[in-house]
């Protein structure tokens, strides 16, 4: 019997959910679909620079699952960029983390104030 599916945790829904090459009508484009969880994995690892173990903990998944999700997301983004495809971010099984960002496993919300000299 397979393990039950764990609900993944994300910090927020992406502000923009669709990207396409400029100057090409939508009707002529192929499309890659990136799940909301895959977008969150990219954000945590590539944008915030978290280690995979930290990012997996924040998303409430195992490190190997995070690694597979990150690989899939990077493949889809690279394919869309290099082959002129549209990229849609939607879908998945997730919950939005309601904790304030300073209580999560990520860097603090605000940068440290500059030191006075």
From Swiss-Prot:
Signal peptide: none annotated. SUPFAM superfamilies: Sigma3 and sigma4 domains of RNA polymerase sigma factors (SSF88659). Pfam families: DUF134. HAMAP family: UPF0251. Belongs to the UPF0251 family. This is UPF0251 protein cbdbA217. It comes from Dehalococcoides mccartyi (strain CBDB1).
